Amino acid sequence: MSLGGGGQQQLQQLSQEIQAIEEEVEELEADVASLRQEQTEIEEAKEALDVLETGATVQVPLGGDAYVRAEVKDMDEVVVSLGGGYAAEQDSDAAASVLDEKKATIDGRIDDVQAEIADLSEEAEQLEQQAQQAQQQMMQQQMQAQQQPQDGEQ
């Protein structure tokens, strides 16, 4: 049972478009997961600012899942990344404000990416409906073509 050549091309094109959208959605979902990880790290940093005191013992990551214990010498000044490879020493309140701003920016980016995912998902759904309609039309045409010779024989 073969489908008409033009209809097959249309179905193949729709299928490719749907697949491309699904791949883009997967990439965007990975972006959201990465942004959520950043959110978690910011929340943990803010919590540490609230909890840590001068003289506290902490574990400092060295990389490769290796840590060293260290004593906090001064919680009055905190070094905060400003982005672009720059950092600044600020008091705890100012550092917390910088972290709040970063989190708000990430929240906005997550909202934007999720909106894009929703738009793409809707587009994919519309394309899937078009593909189903095209396939149904082709099957109806094929059934009609098969029935015509039989009608003439009677």
From Swiss-Prot:
Name where it's found: Cytoplasm
One of its GO biological process terms is: protein folding
The Gene Ontology terms for molecular function here are: unfolded protein binding
Q: How does it assemble?
A: Heterohexamer of two alpha and four beta subunits.
What residue spans carry the Low complexity bias annotation?
A: 127-154
Taxonomically, which superkingdom? Archaea
Coiled-coil stretches are none
Give the record's family classification: Belongs to the prefoldin subunit alpha family.
Can you say what this protein is called? Prefoldin subunit alpha
Q: What is its main location?
A: cytoplasm
Q: Which UniProt keywords apply?
A: Chaperone, Cytoplasm
Disulfide pairs here are: none
Explain the purpose of this protein.
Answer: Molecular chaperone capable of stabilizing a range of proteins. Seems to fulfill an ATP-independent, HSP70-like function in archaeal de novo protein folding.
| GO annotations of cellular component type | cytoplasm; prefoldin complex
Region described as Disordered: 123-154
* HAMAP family for this protein: PfdA (MF_00308)
Q: Which InterPro entries match?
A: PFD_alpha_archaea (IPR011599), Prefoldin (IPR009053), Prefoldin_subunit_alpha (IPR004127)
